[in-house]
Design a protein with these regions (language model features):
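Acyl-donor-binding surface of acyltransferase catalytic domains
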Residues: 1-18
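Acetyl-CoA-dependent GNAT
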Residues: 9, 54-101, 106-110, 123, ...
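Glycine-rich phosphate/pyrophosphate-binding loop shared by adenosine-nucleotide-utilizing enzymes
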Residues: 22-24, 82-88, 176
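A short beta-loop-alpha structural element at the N-terminal edge
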Residues: 23-36
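Active-site acidic-Proline motif in GNAT/NAT acetyltransferases
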Residues: 107-112, 116, 144-145
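Conserved acetyl-CoA pyrophosphate-binding loop and the N-cap/start of the following alpha-helix
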Residues: 113, 117-125
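Conserved GNAT acetyl-CoA-binding A-motif
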Residues: 123, 130-142
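Conserved catalytic-core motifs of GNAT/GCN5-like acyltransferases
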Residues: 139-142, 154-176
Length: 188
């Protein structure tokens, strides 16, 4: 399996066009992005942040992510427009163990850049990276309240494999269902 850090060196940064013609830059998150990433997450609507696994408005959470960057286990891909982060997608995977053939995708996009193809661009890049790494499956966990995200992933070939009722609680303690979606990738 090729090391992710080698793929990154050969692939990024790159430019992509949103559906409205806006040119954005895609690149890996780096240590110098700490403040910009915190500002990005603090600007996300509360209803988006409630569904995330961590409190991304806490500077300590972002600081830990930044100082523990390890592209060979988690690849954080950011979209930048005019020097501001407008999207964050991560591919989580382990090179060892019984899930070494699987990756998990996580995605957020700024509200101003939704319905312009940003999520599709970010996730498609992660799919390409996962394929390059020899991963066989990708998963995403989505609360049903994020129905637009569900349709985005469905459009990109992810299939619902489980709907777990009352399985998670958001940051305010409100119980919610969780949908698990899987996309099969070509086997190497």
């Amino acid at each position: 399996m090729e090391k992710l850090s080698e793929i990154i060196i050969n692939t990024y940064p790159k430019t992509a066009a949103l559906e409205d013609g806006t040119l954005i830059t895609l690149r890996p998150l780096v240590k110098e992005d700490e403040q910009a990433l915190l500002e990005y997450f603090q600007e996300l609507p509360l209803e988006d942040r409630l569904c995330l696994k961590e409190d991304v408005t806490d500077p300590k959470v972002i600081e830990n992510w930044i100082h523990e960057l390890d592209y060979d286990n988690v690849f954080p891909l950011i979209a930048v427009d005019g020097g501001r982060i407008i999207g964050d997608a991560t591919l989580h995977f382990s090179p060892i163990g019984w899930t070494k053939h699987q990756g998990e995708v996580r995605l957020t996009t700024s509200t101003q850049h939704r319905v312009k193809g940003l999520g599709t661009i970010l996730v498609q890049n992660l799919i390409d990276i996962a394929s390059g790494l020899g991963l066989e499956q990708l998963s995403i966990e989505i609360p049903p309240v994020l129905d637009k995200a569900f349709y985005l992933f469905e459009k990109l070939g992810f299939k619902e494999v489980a709907h777990l009722q009352g399985f998670v609680k958001d940051m305010e303690g409100k119980e919610s269902d969780l949908v698990l979606m899987i996309r099969q990738l070509s086997k190497s």
